[in-house]
Structures are given as C-alpha cells and as structure tokens.
Amino acid sequence: MIYSKRLILVVGPTGTKKSYLANMLAKKLNVPIISADAYQVYKELNAGVNKPSEKTLSEIKYHFISNISIFDEWSIAHFNKRAKEILEQAPDWTIVCGGSHLYVNSLINDYQLEKQELDTDLFDALDKLDNQEIFNQLCEYDFQEAIKIGKNNRKRLLRALYLFKKYGKKAKNDSKKFDYVVVKCMSDKEKLFPYLSKRLDEMIHDLNWTKEIEYLDKIITDKKLDKELIAMKALGYKEIYDAWKNNQPIDKEIINKKFKRLVKHQLTWTRNKFNDGMKQFTFNFFEDDANRTCDEIIEYIKSNHD
C-alpha cells in the first residue's frame, strides 16, 4: 500500500533542538506532531526525557506524549500500529519528530510487524549469536533502542536486530510507503557536548530529577514490581536512581559519557539514513536561523506539493 499522506521527518541526535524546530514548523503549518521517542510516551517520566511543556501541548496537537504508564507495554510494533491509525485521520502533512530512529524507520518503510512471515534462515543465524554480540550489532542501528532493551532481554534484542536486518535496508525494487521531507538536525560535537553537559545540570537541579526518581521508586515498590522496567532504562535514570538509593552524589561524568556515546551513534545514523525522501534540509541550532529554515521548508512544500 502506498499512502497518500506525507511526512516531515525531524531527526537528529539528542540536544540538536529537534523539538524546537518541529514545534515552530507545526505552528506555522498548523499540523500535528507524532513523537518518535522511546520514553516521552510514559506519563510518569518527565525530568529526564525533555517532554514538550504544557503550554506547547495546548498549542500543538502531539501524539505519544504521556499516553501510557510505565507499567504498560510499549514497543516498536505498538508505535507502528498506532501511528498508522493516526495518519489515516491526519491532514495531508504530519511531522514526525524524535531520536528513536527505529520507530521512524518502521513507519516510513511500512514494517508489517503483525503480519510478517519469519525469515527462518536470517533468524536462525542471528539466534546463534550470544547476547553481547546481538546487543553490539543492534547498537550500530539504534543505540537508544539497544540500551532501552538491555543486554539480558534476549527475546526483544533478537527481534529488534532481526527487524533491522530484514527491513532496515529496503530491497532495490522496494518503494517507500510514505513520501517525506526530512530535516536533519546536526551539530559539531565540539559545540554539542558542552551544551549537553549544561543541560544535564539543569535537568538535575532545576527539574528535580532526584525527586522524580524517589516518586518512581515508591510507585514501583508499592506495586511490588521489578525495578528493571523498560521505562526506567531511559538515559540517566539508572545513574540517578543508584546515587539516590545509596545516598551518594550523582556522578554526572558517567551520564555525560553515555550522552556522548548516544550522540555519536545518532550522528552516524542521521547522516547515513533517510536519504531517499522528496527533499532534504539541514538545521544547525548553533548556526542557522530556525525561522528561516521553517520558511524554506514551507516554501518547498507549497511550491511542489499543493
């Protein structure tokens, strides 16, 4: 099936102001935003996941922000199915914004996750790998998704890697299912890393991250559930939790190192993927004017796809 709806993908590493640009573009075009973020969907997570503000949510129609509890199941298949249902009712253009690239990839390449026939040769070959080997390979495709799943959840690791190996690169005669314009939000690491370090300080001190961790610990304990919930694997949450539980100072250097590792993977992914859309734009928050970038995108859309 080829869909008539068109997408504006706003992708890039964490900290490159994807949401800032997407929000501005959504207001100018009066279109909704589908959040392709692995953690913003959980209503209990706030301080560490950079959700849109209440003011922004009152001005822009967002999907997959605070939709479910950390105790609910959420996966690529859930996102894929729900996003397609939303797009059936959406206007001609919809923005998809987020750093969980497997989510974005599953949508534009129309993964049929519920109906797929198993490629037994590929699955059997991957099943011979140990958990660390599967984890390492998945990191090359989507570092954030690999971290979210964790090294010990073999079933989910294997499924995610299988999806990438099977569907991540389309066959030469396969056509994309959604037409899309892509905006790649990029920045030099030399400018991005200091910014991320400063943002981490703000998340810890201004947004009461530790207080949120204390609340999460209480509700998880009350339900007598394992602390190893998928939602709690969002970047920084384990480190903040361990520091709080052991009454120790937060080791910001460890969290910063994980941010840097994530960014390096996301930079490589963003450069190499989403290159077969109708038009590609780039946005560097440190150098480019967001208004001008939005106007260029809108001019292209109006002049080519009325």
Curated annotation (Swiss-Prot):
It holds the Pfam family IPPT. It catalyses: adenosine(37) in tRNA + dimethylallyl diphosphate = N(6)-dimethylallyladenosine(37) in tRNA + diphosphate. The keyword Transferase applies. Its EC number is 2.5.1.75. Its cofactor is Mg(2+). The record marks 100 as: Interaction with substrate tRNA. Keywords: ATP-binding, Magnesium, Nucleotide-binding, Transferase, tRNA processing. It comes from the Bacteria. Gene3D superfamilies: 1.10.20.140, P-loop containing nucleotide triphosphate hydrolases. ATP binds at residues 12-19. The keyword ATP-binding applies. Monomer. This is tRNA dimethylallyltransferase. It comes from Mycoplasmoides gallisepticum (strain R(low / passage 15 / clone 2)).
